[in-house]
């Protein structure tokens, strides 16, 4: 089984010793080759870098280094938004209003046969994606 990782999960993992123990255990149990990112996650991290820059240059620099590490670690496993993902997102977002990035992540997961790993499982409920929230106990579920 392979997984598409949301920003909230990789950000939690980044906390190291302060990471939620359920998230930490789950992440450590998955082979690197089974973990994928969306280009949207890289964009969200970049946004964090830029938002921090004017008020906390040290934090911005640390986030910039982390972004580079993530891009390097996930080279070849970063998925973009193509016509198939856009089509799936259009179908999902017609069901009900959903946050755009969460919907595009769910569409990317469905299109690529991946399980979406996110803390925002309720945001994509009822859209047909297989979702795992490692903050919660229980099995993966199609929502």
Predicted segments — roles?
Residues 1, 106, 111-143:
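Acidic, PIN/NYN-like endoribonuclease modules and their adjacent C-terminal/linker elements
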Residues 1-41, 51-65, 69, 138-143:
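Short, well-structured N-terminal submotif of metal-dependent ribonuclease cores
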Residues 6, 44, 102, 120-123:
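Acidic active-site catalytic centers that drive phospho-/nucleotidyl reactions
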Residues 10, 42-45, 86, 124:
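A generic structural signal for short hydrophobic patches within well-formed alpha-helices
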Residues 14, 49, 93, 128, ...:
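Short, flexible helix/strand-to-coil boundary loops that buttress conserved ligand/catalytic motifs
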Residues 31, 74, 127-128:
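Short, structured coil segments at secondary-structure junctions
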Residues 36, 79, 132:
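General small-molecule cofactor/ligand-binding pocket signal
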Residues 47-50, 61, 72-119, 143:
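Active-site neighborhoods of divalent-metal-dependent phosphate/nucleic-acid chemistry enzymes
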């Amino acid at each position: 089984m392979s997984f598409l990782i949301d920003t909230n999960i990789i950000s939690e993992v980044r906390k190291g010793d302060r990471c939620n123990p359920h998230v930490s255990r789950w992440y450590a149990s998955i082979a690197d080759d089974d973990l994928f990112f969306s280009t949207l996650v890289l964009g969200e991290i970049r946004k964090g870098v830029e938002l921090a820059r004017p008020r906390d240059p040290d934090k911005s620099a640390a986030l910039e280094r982390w972004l580079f590490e993530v891009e390097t670690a996930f080279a070849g496993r970063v998925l973009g938004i193509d016509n198939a993902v856009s089509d799936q997102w259009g179908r999902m977002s017609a069901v009900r209003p959903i946050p755009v990035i969460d919907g595009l992540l769910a569409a990317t997961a469905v299109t690529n046969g991946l399980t979406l790993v996110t803390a925002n499982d309720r945001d994509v409920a009822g859209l047909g994606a297989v979702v795992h929230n490692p903050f919660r106990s229980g099995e993966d579920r199609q929502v």
